[in-house]
Amino acid sequence: CVFSVGGGDVVRNISPNIVVALDEAKARNLTIIGIVGRDGGYTKKVGDVVIVVPVVDENLITPHSEAFQAVIWHALASHPVLMIEKNKWEGVES
């Protein structure tokens, strides 16, 4: 799963590590899921399922994208099927 603001860009050499990882995933026939900001960049181009966070304010693309991504990864980490251990604060007595 790719969490990125721009999603990588081959031409402008932005986040080349993401580009290489995506190419490797494609070469191995893996499913690519991404949550990205802006237009999604390379992740949007080659990904199988990609959510592009809408731009609300050009000056806040990074924090809006990362905030949305944080909600998703916390939901994944807290999902009962995926959770290995309970969340700390949910297990603390009042």
Language model feature labels by segment:
Residues 1-89:
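Glycine-rich phosphate-binding loops that contact phosphosugars or nucleotide phosphates
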